[in-house]
Amino acid sequence: MSRVAKNPVKLPAGVEVKFAGQQLSVKGAKGTLELNIHSSVEIVEEAGELRFAARNGDQQTRAMAGTTRALVNNMVQGVSQGFERKLQLVGVGYKAQAKGTVLNLALGFSHPVDYELPEGITAETPSQTDILIKGIDKQLVGQVAAEIRDFRPPEPYKGKGVRYADEVVRRKEAKKK
């Protein structure tokens, strides 16, 4: 059995789990998330926690049980607390402004970049150079942050660009004659 799958997922107060065939639904204070469970993974709810097991003992099913456990744990954490990712804009004239479901970015191009936020994701701009992306789906929050970063990734010589708040940009020395 996968070592990850051996640990149960504790359900905090206010989080409700429902099974409908191979469909798992997790409902909490911040919203609802759904996941299709692989047929080789068995989930049992007991005493306020979820336990995961592989139906047969081969390597792929054990790995799938661990993966499912990690995904369900992220769903439980998302509907109870939510996820957030912080981005920083570094560079002269680089600005961000959130207007509803659109994020307006000035990243040194000849045109402004308008990024349409997907459903379930919100963006805040505490300052013109900081972007805070929030949502209940961990994968979607990370995907949106990566797409925004891809507009202008940090370059190694001056460090200008869009970076994650916890990212360390490797710097290069300029060529000398």
UniProtKB/Swiss-Prot annotation:
Q: Name one GO biological process term.
A: cytoplasmic translation
Assembly state and interactors? Answer: Part of the 50S ribosomal subunit.
Query: HAMAP family annotated for this entry?
Result: Ribosomal_uL6_B
Q: Would the keyword Lipoprotein turn up in this protein's UniProt record?
A: no
What are the UniProt keywords, alphabetically? Ribonucleoprotein, Ribosomal protein, RNA-binding, rRNA-binding
Please give the function described in this protein's UniProt entry: This protein binds to the 23S rRNA, and is important in its secondary structure. It is located near the subunit interface in the base of the L7/L12 stalk, and near the tRNA binding site of the peptidyltransferase center.
Similarity section? Belongs to the universal ribosomal protein uL6 family.
Its protein name is Large ribosomal subunit protein uL6
**Which InterPro entries does the entry link to?**
Ribosomal_uL6-like, Ribosomal_uL6-like_a/b-dom_sf, Ribosomal_uL6_a/b-dom, Ribosomal_uL6_bac-type, Ribosomal_uL6_CS
Which Gene Ontology terms of cellular component type are present? Answer: cytosolic large ribosomal subunit
GO MF entry, a single one: rRNA binding
Q: Which Gene3D superfamilies match?
A: Ribosomal protein L6, alpha-beta domain
What PANTHER family does the database record attribute to this sequence? Answer: 60S/50S RIBOSOMAL PROTEIN L6/L9 (PTHR11655), LARGE RIBOSOMAL SUBUNIT PROTEIN UL6M (PTHR11655:SF14)
